[in-house]
Amino acid sequence: MSHQALTRPIRDWLVDQALDNPDIVKMFETMCQRLTAVGVPITRARLIWQTLHPLFRAETVIWDKGKDAVLEQFLHQDDSTDAWERSPLRYVLHNDVQVLRRELQGPNETLDFPILSELKEQGFTDYLVLATRIDHAITTGDPNLAGARGIIVTWASDRPNGFSNDDLDSLQQIQRIFALACKTVIQSRISTNIATTYLGKRAGRSVLNGQIRRGDGMHTPAVVWFSDLRNSTAYAESMAAETYFSMLNAYFETTAGALVNHGGEVLDFIGDAVLGIFPFEDETQLEEAVLRANSALDEALALSREKNEARAGSGQEQFKFGVGLNVGEVKFGNIGIPQRLSFSVIGHTVNEVARIESMTKLL
């Protein structure tokens, strides 16, 4: 039976995956296992794509024969490393290359990237990179990677003669269908990243689950957090924009960062104020929510002392802030006008916590 006939069930399965929303790690692992089962001699495979996330520029699934596939993420600053600069993946991205094959042994041996020498030392004999460009996909916003978007898969074999022509044909035939299935999953992941980054986890999930109309929402008991930066108007008027933003982010890292570290959720940055909640379901969880909120407050105060000592040592302006906490039921949902909404909390508990915070100015 031909390779094309052997891999047809895999292609059909990938079409089904594209119509679903599978776990991308499991999908890649299963595809690799099915390819090896029909005789394609892969022993190492990597799936790489760029994402849209405040921390990560790219994600990759790592599969090695006999092991479970795992997901790894690359920070934005990782693209400046020497390893990346000398990577075949960077070459493929920057030169819009769709197929790159390197034989690692024999008369056609080509080791023009450092990783190829490493793979040869590990016993690999053949290396293949397949890239599928996806229009209307995401971009990192990095001008150095403009247009560098799509799905990249690398395959490596340790069979003595490497990949046969039939193997190469099979992998290239599967690539486009697999890229389509990946696009479905990746766009869903990116939507979740964007929703949770700008709305928070709870609000993001609610919106993605269909609560998109004005008035959609829920009632929930919560410990509500409201913090506000002192003298922000004076700082904004007297400081250079870059200096002011640096202070503002240091303050947000101190307050919102502590809130998140203790299980809270940031709902909104209102100018230089932070609005967040520690939700709980019933009275049995109230004490835990209060303890988490108080622990977050303690951490924020400790962090502010550390940051202000460092800022004073470097001649920078120190910052101060107030925090108010309140417990009660809040209305959590969509407010605004039909075509422009904000997912936030409203109610007397929120109004009270803002007034409580303002009282810290008198202390």
Listing of model-derived features with the role each one plays in the protein:
Residues 249-263, 284-323, 327, 348-359:
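Alpha-helical scaffold within the catalytic cores of cyclic-nucleotide enzymes
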Residues 8-16, 21-36, 112-116, 168, ...:
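Short amphipathic alpha-helical segments
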Residues 67-129:
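Regulatory sensory and allosteric helical modules in signal-transduction proteins
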Residues 213-295, 343:
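Catalytic NTP-binding/metal-coordinating core of nucleotidyl cyclase/transferase enzymes
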Residues 134-172:
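Regulatory loop-to-helix N-cap segments in sensory/regulatory domains
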Residues 165-219:
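Regulatory cytosolic signal-relay segments
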Residues 277-288, 323-343, 359-362:
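Catalytic strand-loop-helix junctions within cyclic-nucleotide turnover domains
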Residues 20-70, 262:
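Helix-loop-beta substructure at the N-terminus of cytosolic sensory domains
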